Amino acid sequence: GKLNENENLEAVYEKCTPYKIEKYLKMDIPYKKIITTPESFPKIRKAARKLNINIYKEYFCLFDECEKLTQDVDYRRKISQPIYDFFQFEQKAFVSATPLEMSHPEFERQDFQLIRIVPDYDYKKDLELIVTNSYYKRLRIVLDNLKDSKHICIFFNVTDGIADLIGNLGVTDYKVFCSQQSVNKLKKRGLVNAYSQIDYPLAKYNFFTCRFYSALDIRIGRYKPDILMLTDLRIAQWTMIDPFTEAIQIQGRFRRKGNDDVTYNSLTHITTVNPNIHIRSNEEIRNRVEQFITNYNLLKGQQETDEFKKGAILEDMENMKYQDLIDERGEINPFSIDNLYNEERVRSYYQSADKLYQAFLGTGFFN
């Protein structure tokens, strides 16, 4: 979407070739702007080095939707790879409408400043929160009340759950927007209207996974959509939606048309809760992480000094419980540690209807 609106942009993603990046970097235009996924950033670095371009001096690095490094690093291990490059840029910024606290020591070491922009107008949005034990029954009631809606946009972060919903509801006028891997999975189940890129016009029922809608701009056509956010803890805990980040980002995907500030008709979150969810305290997480780091560094030291046991020690390191906290350089990844705290924070909201309600109020964004 962003690429189509600006001919001077270059989008670097999974299928983009190094030759294409080099060709763009050689273009004789006053300003160059490259948009990339974190996973594809090494392609830019490689192309720049080949052309003897010092991107760290000549380019400004803007890391958008920066909370995703914390939120997604547990299943997108490569999302934080460019952080070493990021800190080498002379001009740089981490930005988001919904940032999370970050513990990476380099921010303090490089004297980063926290700048908060507060609107001087009323930006709060109305949201209906429905907490239920009769999940599908309530969902059917809500959808029945929206039967005259031209476009219903449903955000549900589990592909199999989306497939089941489409089957159970018997809908035919639908589109699913998700990763290419999920597209292939859905098509094997006979759901042919699945896309890895936004496809217009929107259908009556439009399903989005969280991996897809991040940083996406959804154009509003003639009719405004109704938005449903779904969380079903019986299916998967990763269907939880964080009121402080994801809920705000979801409604913000729909861009204003002209001077119209209202971009959708309604915003609803249907969810189950689980009072039996065990929440680790910050102290418990801190103790576990500190013990892991101690054990990891001990094994790492032995690996460096004992050549004969190197293979066995490496295997022990890879089998450690918190191995996911280690980045591709073998260093402790601060974003992975932040992820542990963040997940417990979000999980705590789903212990009761009141806790979730208070969380939505606490954002200062929703009525």
Where are these regions (language model features)?
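Conserved strand-helix element at the start of the C-terminal RecA-like helicase core
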Residues: G1-L3, I34-P38, R138-G170
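The feature captures the C-terminal accessory region of ATP-dependent helicases
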Residues: N282, N287-N367
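Inter-Walker segment of RecA-like/P-loop motor cores
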Residues: N6-R49, K188-Y195
